Amino acid sequence: TAITVAEVGATQMACSSIQVVEPLKIIPFYIDVAKGYEWSTDLGVMETLGGECQRWFEKEPVGVLAAITPWNVPTQVNLAKIIPALAAGCCVVLKPAPDTSWTGLALGKLIAENTDFPPGVVNVVSAADPAAGSYLTDDHRVDMISFTGSTVTGRKVMEAASANITKVFLELGGKSALIVLDDVEDFGMVAATAAFGMATVCGQGCALSTRILLPRSRYGEAVDAIAAMMAAVPPGDPTDAATMMGPLISARQRDRVEGYVQSAIDEGARIVCGGSRPDGMDRGFFYEPTLIADVDNSMTVAQEEIFGPVLVAIPFEDDDEAVMIANDSIYGLSGAVFSGDEQRALQVAKQIRTGTMSVNGGVWYGADVPFGGFKQSGIGREMGTAGFEEHLETKSYSKPV
């Protein structure tokens, strides 16, 4: 936890959930999956080409996994890649992000000192240069590449892997929509979901719902409720247990956020709250929780992943337009819908082209839940049994009877 707070800027609250404590549940889950998995499947006897044959197929490890991980939730992603790979029988080379090398190296040290894995089964390679990952993506001895990061870098990983036809898992960017239907009685839950979800990782999460779609008939009411809730989660010292939102990871990331906020202003949007660095917080890369209203879905801030504590509020007329706006994105990683009618909410949720959906505040995160994206948000699934099977090959057998 101390390393995560110091390196990521994560709050104590985040470390007690998504940053450290919850990811630890990945370990026992995959132990149980491996123990109970059907490694061999009997297909029975069949007459084929004039002879009877006994057929079956078996699952075996894909081989050497190159795991390239991001800086936003490093322990979560490192474990989500290493543990299922080991459970499947693979060797792993972990390359953590330069901004969070300590977290990756600490995990490697824990594994080396507390398990009986032979040398070379788990390897951690740290480097200040992000391009160091290309040594792994280009190497023909790597059997699978598992990458979590931006869509821009994901394209480069996929291109590099094509030279050796290396299997690729990609979990990439997102611009997920939180849809609020017009029959919601109270915007309190909506506002809390939007604000506190954003605050947990200071908006630096690919699966966060950063586009808030609101019924035009209640737009002002909803915007006010969300702005009030966001004002209740100001940034603070992550070492203070009472702090709900820490700093951004780096000056580079804060500059990126500021650039997007300025682009929204330039395109005619309105800053409802936040929009600047907080006064008196010069140590650390802090930025105020920011809500931008009067946003059209074609604006840059509605189409591109900002990766900071910025939400955009987009109005819609009816359910059909809400679905259209939500799907009008190159991404498809996550999303949410709120309605006073659960069936109506589910009907909308099923029309959104995305890998995960929260209905009326439901939490989908868990070691047993497959996670991944549609469209340019990725290829394949992490977590769950599906995440285990990503690390397996299928070999079919036949013998005469």
Residue spans of the language-model regions?
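N-terminal Rossmann-like NAD(P)+-binding subdomain of aldehyde/semialdehyde dehydrogenases
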Residues: T1-C53
